[in-house]
Amino acid sequence: MGSVTPIPLPKIDEPEEYNTNYILFWNHVGLELNRVTHTVGGPLTGPPLSARALGMLHLAIHDAYFSICPPTDFTTFLSPDTENAAYRLPSPNGANDARQAVAGAALKMLSSLYMKPVEQPNPNPGANISDNAYAQLGLVLDRSVLEAPGGVDRESASFMFGEDVADVFFALLNDPRGASQEGYHPTPGRYKFDDEPTHPVVLIPVDPNNPNGPKMPFRQYHAPFYGKTTKRFATQSEHFLADPPGLRSNADETAEYDDAVRVAIAMGGAQALNSTKRSPWQTAQGLYWAYDGSNLIGTPPRFYNQIVRRIAVTYKKEEDLANSEVNNADFARLFALVDVACTDAGIFSWKEKWEFEFWRPLSGVRDDGRPDHGDPFWLTLGAPATNTNDIPFKPPFPAYPSGHATFGGAVFQMVRRYYNGRVGTWKDDEPDNIAIDMMISEELNGVNRDLRQPYDPTAPIEDQPGIVRTRIVRHFDSAWELMFENAISRIFLGVHWRFDAAAARDILIPTTTKDVYAVDNNGATVFQNVEDIRYTTRGTREDPEGLFPIGGVPLGIEIADEIFNNGLKPTPPEIQPMPQETPVQKPVGQQPVKGMWEEEQAPVVKEAP
């Protein structure tokens, strides 16, 4: 194709000095690719795969950096002495420049992840991704070479060593098993996930290189086999959740489920409905954390990294941001821990989502069938389709647990473990004092908007007519608060039940009636003060039997704690999922529309966890 004009990207609301640090710079490049790939329909879209890309990037950066600047209190993820070649750290071969090693590792990893493969076993490679998408992603990488602090020396031994490190990680962890939806069909029945009533199908181009040509219908089910089949990164054991109310061992928990229905209607409904009791500030909280795969914004792992960037600079060890090796080491370790935890949180939350296939509130309330509980015409506030003229939507994957809650539980618990004893001291299950100021979400930055016409990728978003989202500047007192608000924000959008985040008794105010929780005079749910919250409640599970966490927050915390306690070690090969053919389910009832591709990528759609 001919010359390509870069998509105009709105400026990020953070100090420009952040990217004078080369660890933060390459993190920034990874985050730019996240928002661009979701804008152009490129590879690695959706929450779990976009988290995986950042995890692979920061493991490559971590080992490239610490091979040249060895730490005294931990080791690299790969080992130079292991007998298993798949986990062997390459020889430095004279590499002695950490800056160039990190550049080589980052550029090679990001190119391997986002550029069109030269060789691919699929007989129709890249069928779902346009040439323009790859070209736009290539422009981001080309620009990074020009803007990298200290420059890029591709011929140096250090740069080539970084490339070698990235190659080992890519071969080890680029595991596309389960990303395709081919062979999946929804399971019918009460409590079961199904097509979204407001977006039952999307119309996609038959030829991705001809977006204005013929269209075909496509039903979206994002990565149904991913959690059970893909390689984990650094967890050392299995992680399970309790059964949700209404299913299996908790089939008799009708009071808990019925009260959750009431909360969903009151707190997650569309703004115009009389039954909606959510406050304007709670509506803002729902939008603030969204990052639902929208144009120019991307997915939640991008926002979590933006927050961690601000935390990292706020609590840096030395004042010199650009040149301090102490800060470089600090950031390289922090982002590897955070993004590996985020990756494994995505794997285990997707494993449990598709294990239970629990319906979303939009389906649950509309299909309830009981006149005194459900509403067949109910609408949610919904996941925002920011920078489009589309209506809000229900994510195309099951509810329990919340991906947001699991990702946030893992990310912010890892931050809490990393800074404990440095910013202050706290127990692992109680509030911290990691406060941050001036945190702005791109969902509410005074720039991004709800458009009145289709998005134009050739024009700056500032020049496109629509309702501009108000710029809201936030302060948070702790990572404990970040973790909690991120989780409950999904209740306010109506895309999640309260138990998708955490057990009701851990976050709500009990009443004298079992499994019924307090409301204010307006009928809105009353949440506990964040400093009083502890995620301690456990519930039963049919298989395996036992007591397990309820919801995404404690699942994410559990994953982060395990990774941190074990010092960021690889998941042992013997406990990785066994290679298997993608399961094929026989359709029940109406034959679903065929998937639009059979490729090693998740569907390129707008999605929310």
UniProtKB/Swiss-Prot annotation:
SUPFAM superfamilies linked: Acid phosphatase/Vanadium-dependent haloperoxidase
Changes after translation: The N-terminus is blocked.
Chain residue ranges for the region called Disordered: 569-609
Residues reported to bind vanadate: K353, R360, S402, G403, H404, R490, H496
Coiled coil: none
Homology family: Belongs to the vanadium-dependent haloperoxidase family.
Protein name: Vanadium chloroperoxidase
